[in-house]
Amino acid sequence: MNAMGLIFTNDGNLGELTNKRTMASLPFGGRYRQVDFALSNLSCAGIKHIGIISRHSYQSLMNHVGDGEEWGLELEEGGLEFLTPYAHSTIGTYRGKLESINNAMDFLEVGDEEDYVVMVDSAVLCNIDINKVLEAHIASGKDVTVVTKKGVCNGQKKIDLAVAVENGEVTEMMVDYNADEKYVASMDIFVIGKKLLMKSVNILVARDKVHMDRDLVMGGWRRGMISVNVYEYEGVALFNESVEEYFANSLSLIEKEVRADLFGAAHPVYTKVRDRVPTYYGENSEVEDCLVADGCMLDGEVENSILFRQVTVEEGAEVEDCIVMNDTVIEKDAEVKYAILDKNVTVTAGTKLIGSKKSPIYVKRGETV
């Protein structure tokens, strides 16, 4: 397809989970990072010129993605490029997506063979056929296509961009709004002509308008300057925009139907390859309804949990409804329920950590409790 890609790393509202990492580099599903979904969606569509924009704390993201080899992006021309946050900005860091694009104009100008830009965020995880979105965008004749999801708007969750549609046409848009079922939620995936994007960004940023949803899409549509097409996505879409959503969406992967949709064979989700020995299940281990990555040592009881690589659960320990990241050790007779344990955590022998479904306990990286 005649398009280039922009990935926004998004800081989100995940508190300590993203204090020292971007949303894009947040571990998910036992062996992935959230950016893997955006990169895979774009690369599977044949898009080979992709820029990743990040505000800060992007070292772990760069370490994970590297030169993009796993996604077929280690190319002499095009390929993957990290767009640094301070390239041309006089304010130190950008305030919104339009300002970040303004700082990445050189990247857009280099892609003189591409007519369209596909912009995706790393907070919403899905396995979407970007070629179908591009085809629908071109067929619509509209300036911007917004990918949306039904069933997210319920009047209780604040939606970044909520869109009302009747007979295939947009009738209203709201930003940061507790939208009801009348609306569909933007998945933060947009398609726009490259020349129009560059022109719009130049004009809006000069007027101190820096937000994609509010200023370009909704603002342009309300002023009659931008026509908007809506592409309704019918597959699984996981909005990881809070700690509670991240926790619930992670555990939803235990459901076979969710996994089958999110990791469909037609569009694989690629990630950095790490060779590890198989997981060891001791004679006293009991593991039920879990996703377990390679290299774990399991001698205790684990139920309804996600275990990343090289996790140790010692004999007598109980782990239930938990997300346990790489190299974490849960010692003998410890009890951990409804918790997110970051990398290299040690839960000492006999310790009890009991959270709740709506308020999981979080233990930060490297802590001993």
Predicted features, each with a name:
Residues 1-251, 363:
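Unchanged
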Residues 1-8, 195, 203-369:
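Left-handed beta-helix
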